[in-house]
UniProtKB/Swiss-Prot annotation:
Belongs to the DapB family. Homodimer. It catalyses: (2R,4S)-2,4-diaminopentanoate + NAD(+) + H2O = (2R)-2-amino-4-oxopentanoate + NH4(+) + NADH + H(+). The keyword NADP applies. Transmembrane segments: none annotated. This is 2,4-diaminopentanoate dehydrogenase. GO terms for molecular function: 2,4-diaminopentanoate dehydrogenase activity; 4-hydroxy-tetrahydrodipicolinate reductase. The keyword NAD applies. It comes from the Bacteria. Involved in the ornithine fermentation pathway. Catalyzes the oxidative deamination of (2R,4S)-2,4-diaminopentanoate ((2R,4S)-DAP) to yield 2-amino-4-ketopentanoate (AKP). Although Ord is more efficient with (2R,4S)-DAP, the diastereoisomer (2R,4R)-DAP can also be metabolized. Ord is specific for NAD as hydrogen acceptor. It comes from Unknown prokaryotic organism. One of its GO terms (biological process) is ornithine metabolic process. Keywords: Allosteric enzyme, NAD, NADP, Oxidoreductase. NCBIfam families: ornith_Ord (NF040740).
Amino acid sequence: MGKNVKTLIWGFGAMGSGMASILLEKGGYELVSVIDTHPQKAGKDVGELLGRAPLGVKVTMDHLKAFGSHPDVALIATSSFVEEVSPQIEFALENDANVITIAEEMSYPWIDSKEIAERLDALALNRGKTVLGTGINPGFVLDTLVVSLSGVCKEVRHIHAKRVNDLAPFGPTVMRTQGVGTTPEKFEEGIRSGNIVGHIGFRQSIMLIAKALGWTIEDIVEERQPIITNVRRKTNYVDVTPGNVAGCRHTARAYSCGREVIFLEHPQQVCPEAEGVRTGDYVVIDGDPPVNLRIEPEIPGGTGTMAMAVNMIPLVVNAPPGLLTMIDLPVPRSISNGF
């Protein structure tokens, strides 16, 4: 084994702090810097914030100071959107760090932010570094996993993938973006205004699958519908009464050569078991041979995202430079001791 990989974490919320804990549990890594804009975290020891012994690494709001530790890789967990994370990615690249971000739109940024994607790719190539967007979804369940399963097929005609999860552990921000707790009328208003977005990443997952399978996508049609509860559903953050919205049923259909080739579903709601709905991840490939995969319950989104980001570090550090996707890299795997 070579020297430890010096790692910086940008964004020390639930995901960033979870990544830090995973890094500290594995060998082969050295957590050298943490950046966060929350004033109550700034200046505090990372170990103490994690409920551990002091590490001698303090959270800072000073980006330049943080990168003075010369990290090999920066894990960015600050936003879902390309426009918001691209300045952070550029700063990391300019300071000679590889980048792994869990921003959903960065899993395939060319589809909605082509100019930014091309700029990031050019900068990464110029600096000899690698940039990757990943996570549980997009990044795995509705794209990388699907692509891997297609490898046993002589032919693929249609793909149907679905993720059913429980939003109960999530906080107010997620509840608002999914419309949880609103009336059906307010849900429709939120869809029109853009305040209720449903799942972020369908378009990116579709393009990852299409690129891997050599399909040309002509159109993507998305639909968002409210999931109305018939029973009371209560979490630590929201109390949903019968007749109101417990979540968002978001779907996306992709067309090639005039026919549907990909159908993705992601109904997200609080306490689905309250009405007999089982959580799970499902992939059905109409191919030769056909493939039907069921994972129940669903792969936990939080843990899965944190683990995927950390587990991709060795693959990214050893990858060719540029802005890459999950289908450009070897199969993800859990590496117990760094490299």
